[in-house]
Amino acid sequence: MSKKGRNKGEKPEALIVALQAANEDLRTKLTDIQIELHQEKSKVSKLEREKTQEAKRIRELEQRKHTVLVTELKAKLHEEKMKELQAVRENLIKQHEQEMSRTVKVRDGEIQRLKSALCALRDGSSDKVRTALTIEAREEARKLFDTERLKLLQEIADLKTAKKQVDEALSNMIQADKIKAGDLRSEHQSHQEAISKIKWESERDIRRLMDEIKAKDRIIFSLEKELETQTGYVQKLQLQKEALDEQLFLVKEAECNMSSPKREIPGRAGDGSEHCSSPDLRRNQKRIAELNATIRKLEDRNTLLGDERNELLKRVRETEKQCKPLLERNKCLAKRNDELMVSLQRMEEKLKAVTKENSEMREKITSHPPLKKLKSLNDLDQANEEQETEFLKLQVIEQQNIIDELTRDREKLIRRRKHRRSSKPIKRPVLDPFIGYDEDSMDSETSSMASFRTDRTPATPDDDLDESLAAEESELRFRQLTKEYQALQRAYALLQEQTGGIIDAEREAKAQEQLQAEVLRYKAKIEDLEATLAQKGQDSHWVEDKQLFIKRNQELLEKIEKQEAENHRLQQELQDARDQNELLEFRNLELEERERRSPPFNLQIHPFSDGVSALQIYCMKEGVKDVNIPDLIKQLDILGDNGNLRNEEQVAIIQASTVLSLAEKWIQQIEGAEAALHQKMMELESDMEQFCKIKGYLEEELDYRKQALDQAYMRIQELEATLYNALQQETVIKFGELLSEKQQEELRTAVEKLRRQMLRKSREYDCQILQERMELLQQAHQRIRDLEDKTDIQKRQIKDLEEKSNRKHG
């Protein structure tokens, strides 16, 4: 029996040596895995850099294509303008020739009359009369010539001064436009770079934090495995305790057998043998009582462990109950995403219908038969007014239909939201925090790109207040987006004009010279037209009608821009909702996997001091302070060496001492493992606190950067609006005097048409760019997920190999 006890003492030492060797192997494997992970991270960073470079290259190519398109459009517009000017020039030349022929006829009549008078004078008058008439005719001709020459010289001087002023104004405007365009470009590029940097940094931080959370989850999983092994050790200890109980029962029976013959002998006053044996019996009885007390304490500890196990099972059930609202929320978000998809499809269909109608209207306008020759200015004005009124009426009807449809869609969405809010039950559960999961962190991760309010759980107590605040915020955001969109359209139009001027400087210089020459030609015609209009008294009324039509057209354009901005905002919100739904699904899967693998647990561990027996500390905790376990083991050893006892009793006592020593060693190992686990849990909690602090700092920094960007955008919008207004005022002041109202309106309509075409093309181009970038981002995310799956598979393979090696060593 003593050999068996020694073998049992040697087995743990061999197990410890094997475990140490396995631990060293695992450490080496861990270092190799960490090196591989670092290499994979470097590869991922290289891939991201390459993707950013490719995106930059694609952006540059797109910008070049855009500039080429702009130059082509400018050339087309210039050609159209030249054609129109050529037609106007031909008409004016014809009118001038008609007027010249009329004046020639008048002069011919006067010459014939004078010739007849001269012939009459020549026939019936003398030389004196002839000379007097010739002198008078010469003087009159000289006076007329002088007056006409003075008038022409004065007109030439006025035209030269006007030309100089126009040249100076044009040069100043071109320089100012170039400077402002350069400033706007530089600011736009800097803002775009800052936005891309912020997005890249936020994505990098989110990925890093997710990797840290996954690593901590794996550590927790390994710790839970160690706990399972420790529970196995506890079960082994329970089995050993049962064996101890049996051995103690045998010891008690042996003591009863020893004490029974002594009781039968009657007591004598002077018996020395009874006096010698009584202290040994008392010692044995004390030791047996102490052993019984330790056994009871071990049983109590076993019951406590069972209670803790039951508590852990209750905690698992509670966590399962708490996961149910998250799943319900995910389902609600999926339904909402589907509804938004349906509404977006409807909006896209409506946009297509509107674009078709617009193209049909343009085709009708372009295919409209040419105007007949009008006999008077009144007919011309009436025809122009009728055409403009018809065009404006069509635009008004079209825009009114679009506005009605959009208001209906908006009312439908509002009704659906109200119905959802009224149908939602008010729940107020108390949610315990999960390890490695924070709902606010998920909301902060999705709020960098999302503007839609989906981060509110259905179980919050202040739903109505949050909904009112969200409605106010959405209205403010809508107004801000409309302002930003209008300002960007204006800035885009200005940039298009300025870039075209920079590219085709020589062509524009030639066109400018031609326009100035034509302006000088048209001035006389304009004065005649103004005189005729002043005579008829219709100039002010006509101008007022024109201004009213212009205002109405601007209002319609603003409505169109608002509707387009709302459509763009809805698309962005839908994309944000999709991204948030994907993130929530991914997080839900992670939580389900974590719940499946490792339920949460609560350890209350009191580490023991070095040099003190673990059983002694346990007895002191239970209130038994008289027992000294090292002394008890020594006494058992002494009893085992005592020769007065029988062999069976000695063997039982030796076995009890060995079992107690082994139990003490096992308990020390268990408590050491528990202390290490507790320390690891404390470290993980501290890491989680640091992670939460870092997350809060990052959120604050992101909010600050967003506010700075919003302020910068608002400032840019204000500057662009002031620049646009100033340019409009300058052009009206400087060129309004040179052209007639009709020509100004024609130029404005042509510019508006061109601007609409440019805006439509720019929107299509921006949509294409956004789609391509979203595809690139999705590909990058897919690549990252594949790499993470590969790393998980490698780690699982490594764990399987480690378990196999542990089994072999065991």
Swiss-Prot record:
Sections of the chain in a coiled coil: 13-102, 148-178, 207-244, 280-419, 468-597, 664-808
Protein name: Janus kinase and microtubule-interacting protein 2
Region described as Disordered: 261-280, 437-465
Alphabetic keyword roster: Coiled coil, Golgi apparatus
Signal peptide range: none
Biased composition, class Basic and acidic residues, residue ranges: 261-274
Protein family according to the UniProt entry: Belongs to the JAKMIP family.
GO molecular function, one term: kinase binding
Tissue localization of expression: Highly expressed in brain, moderately expressed in thymus, spleen and lung, and weakly expressed in kidney, liver and peripheral blood lymphocytes. Also expressed in adrenal and pituitary glands, as well as testis.
Compartment list: Golgi apparatus
